[in-house]
Amino acid sequence: VHQEAIVPGTVYVAPGNYHMAIEHNTIQLSQTEKLNGVRPAVDVLFESAAKKYTSDLLAIVMTGMGKDGTVGMTHVKATGGVTIVQDEETSVVYGMPGNAVKAGVVDAIYDLDDIAKLLHDIER
């Protein structure tokens, strides 16, 4: 996946122990320092995606421990993108979504089924 060209409509998943970023319409993997105590960290991806896609970006944080995603969502909001988190009721762990909500960087809160529907509708 490293340096692979980004293809619209494709889902990319960061491999374990690698940060994923977007640079010049390609996937960039790195083993740079852990961020928020983790690698991969979604903050790395969101920050790079915000620079590339600005207001065309939709960032979603779903269930997870810690605060990863909050700083990245701040960048997404600053460049005009849209931010969504999974609701507390359908999250196994509400750490990541909850921290983003507390930081005030979330446009909408959806349950898991509504996130799936949204992604399905966007793909069409």
Where are these regions (language model features)?
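Conserved acid/base catalytic micro-environments in cytosolic active-site loops
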Residues: 1-124
